[in-house]
Amino acid sequence: MENTQENPTSQNPTPADETARQAAEAAAPQQEAAANAATDSPVNAEQSALAEAEAKIAELQESFLRAKAETENVRRRAQEDVAKAHKFAIESFAEHLLPVIDSLEAAVAHSSDDLQKVREGVELTLRQLTGALEKGRVVALNPVGEKFDPHRHQAISMVPAEQEPNTVVAVLQKGFVIADRVLRPALVTVAAPK
């Protein structure tokens, strides 16, 4: 059932009710202003924090782009340096070989019937070539008497010998290393086990 009876105070306000209503109406704009101020303060603070964060992001992005560009430049320069090193790595070695070529050309141009002079010229040229190879860090392996090393030697045969087993007895073809890397293993004969 519906309540047909109305609140008597809602239709006939008392003087105390009227005073309370007026006080509430007067206080409402102040409360609203205080609420707006309270909400404006956090909004302003948030906006300034957001602006600071955006400025920091822009600064970091600029720093990142500069660092990225610098990294790319360093990488490009390093690639160019490596390419130049590959291109001209043999230059110094070739310079050391030029006197050998000069000696061989002089020997070919000068014909001599004296076999001893030809031999001396060939020996001199061989010394020049060996010196040029050594300056290029190419060194001959002469492993006679050493223990057989499969990384530096290639055994052609095993022969009975007085030396310890697996010792290099003879070198059939010299091996060469370049800066501790085997360029060509030495072809050797090895002492057989007794």
Curated annotation (Swiss-Prot):
NCBIfam families, alphabetized: PRK14139.1, PRK14140.1, PRK14150.1
InterPro entries for this protein: GrpE, GrpE_coiled_coil, GrpE_head
Any GO molecular function: protein-folding chaperone binding
Role this protein plays: Participates actively in the response to hyperosmotic and heat shock by preventing the aggregation of stress-denatured proteins, in association with DnaK and GrpE. It is the nucleotide exchange factor for DnaK and may function as a thermosensor. Unfolded proteins bind initially to DnaJ; upon interaction with the DnaJ-bound protein, DnaK hydrolyzes its bound ATP, resulting in the formation of a stable complex. GrpE releases ADP from DnaK; ATP binding to DnaK triggers the release of the substrate protein, thus completing the reaction cycle.
Entries under Pfam families matching the protein: GrpE
Compartments where located: Cytoplasm
Superkingdom field: Bacteria
A cellular component term, taken from the record's GO annotations: cytosol
Segments for region (Disordered): 1-50
Biased composition (Polar residues): 1-14
Keyword terms, alphabetized: Chaperone, Cytoplasm, Stress response
Entry's family note: Belongs to the GrpE family.
Gene Ontology terms: biological process: protein folding
Gene3D superfamilies: 3.90.20.20, Head domain of nucleotide exchange factor GrpE
Record's compositionally biased regions (Low complexity): 21-38
Oligomer status and interactors: Homodimer.
Listed name of the protein: Protein GrpE
